[in-house]
Design a protein with these regions (language model features):
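Nucleic acid-binding interface residues in structured DNA/RNA-binding domains
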Residues: 5-10, 64-177
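Compact structured core domains
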Residues: 18-69
């Protein structure tokens, strides 16, 4: 069974979803891929997993590094799971490029190289935004591209984490936003 709750964050309303194992989704209302993978049958109810996720978000939006993860249970391919596991290793307030992420994944898998676009595709289909920190992945040279919650939110999330914002720029309309 899937359970849902809403969370009113400073950057907009968030839909949280969980099953008995862990958090399965966290989406900003109106985001690209909103509620992607959410079963048609779900119940709005408090669960220990959703309570932990809300506690994590409370700390995060208060400007603190939470220091723990709620139980996570993202559904995805083996490749997506590998990319999402790497996202969880990006430190609070730090960023990596899509190319760096692809190189890390290739190294872990014993491959000579990996496509940054392939890694970016998995990053873009992360169903547990913020907690699995896809907003910490940036384009080459600091280009802030590719956040399903919107570039404005990506900027605000990185600023909240006190990332060095002088290194980043928002590309012109029409370039991989």
């Amino acid at each position: 069974m899937t359970y849902i709750q809403h969370y009113d964050a400073p950057l907009g309303r968030i839909l949280l979803a969980a099953d008995e194992v862990g958090l399965t989704g966290l989406w900003f209302d109106g985001a690209k891929y909103f509620a992607d993978g959410l079963p048609d049958e779900h119940t709005e109810r408090e669960t220990p997993v959703l309570s932990e996720a809300r506690r994590w978000l409370d700390l995060y939006f208060a400007g603190q590094e939470p220091g723990f993860l709620p139980p996570l249970h993202p559904a995805g391919s083996t490749f997506q799971q590998a990319v999402w596991a790497l996202l969880l290793q990006i430190p609070y307030g730090q960023t990596v490029t899509y190319g760096e992420l692809a190189r890390q994944l290739a190294e872990k898998q014993g491959r000579p190289r990996m496509s940054a676009q392939a890694a970016g595709g998995a990053v873009g289909h992360n169903k547990i935004s913020i907690i699995i920190p896809c907003h910490r992945v940036v384009g080459t040279g600091g280009s802030l591209t590719g956040y399903a919650g919107g570039i404005d939110r990506k900027v605000k999330l990185l600023a909240l984490e006190q990332a060095d914002m002088t290194r980043f720029f928002v590309p012109k309309t029409g370039t991989a936003l």
